[in-house]
Amino acid sequence: MRCALLAAVSLPFVFTALPLHAADLSDLTWTTTDDQVTITACDRGAAGELVIPDTIEGNAVTSIGNRAFRGCDSLPSITIPEGVTSIGDIAFQSCTGLTSITIPDSVTSIGDGAFSRCTNLTTIEIGVGNVNYTVVDGVLFNTKMTLLHTYPEGKTGANYTIPDSVTSIGALAFWFCRKLTSITIPEGVTSIGDRAFEVCKGLRSITIPEGVTSIGDFSFGQCTSLTRITIPGSVTTIGDSAFSRCTGLTSITIPDSVTRIGKSAFAVCRNLTSITIPDSVTSIGRYAFQSCEGLTAVTFLGDARKAGGGIFKYATSTIYRKPEAKGWRSTWGGRPVKLISEKP
């Protein structure tokens, strides 16, 4: 079934349903289960200030599904009705015309990246009675402010300090926030979600605090201005593509707490010249250093490990090892192996 949002509504922030007929619902697709409606899609040609009805065919609208409004780039505002409890993953992704959105009191769950790539979204607003989420300076948090959910991509300012109460940075939280050059992460943060800072191309340096144990997949991928990053001794896992295409990085220190380096973790870090792999690392994923064209020296402080396929593809590295280390042959991962004493 398909249904349309009301266009050009002259009553902002009205959450009650306006009279609708089937002919007015041609832009939306929805499903109905147990008398509850989930909006699943919207025609990308829909334009104007749109109001989602609170009922469709006599059934309450309670959910906005994953990707429901993805790519609807001609909607400057969308009114979500009271009664909606769930907003799905990337539900409003790439709504590039959207400048503000208000989340009603009834919402209890907001999916990852729900407002990602909304390039003109400067603030997120929330109903004063919502007990699950709060907004501070336009940034979306859970009520206890332990989770930073979304930093709007269109928000102005080059510097941002994450509040001290935050312990988790959500997946896609700062995705594509290219205006930011500096982000301060407080000491209490223990979790950084997948793609949390991906494509923050203005970000120049960042310190990951002690207590973080895992750096999520793609979490700092394509941060092309990043020249310095500090990884603490609490980190055990560097996720897949965690620092891929960080072309500004020239060096990085991996602490001896790390046991796993994910696939493509440092791929296309073209200006990375050297790296030291501690003895603690037992697993290195395929393509981990692919296309690191400037990487001339990789020093291993322990025994030889199983190399993932293509680990040094398009790289010209030389491997250096300790003389007492075991399992090494004349080549590893397709690159020559020498003793550390032979290092230039």
Provide a role label for each language-model segment.
Residues 4-17:
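Bacterial N-terminal signal peptides
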Residues 1-6, 95, 103, 107, ...:
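Charged, compositionally biased non-catalytic regions
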Residues 13-15, 141, 176, 218, ...:
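Aromatic (phenylalanine/tyrosine) cluster motif
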Residues 27-36, 45-63, 73-86, 95-109, ...:
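Structural signature of tandem-repeat unit edges
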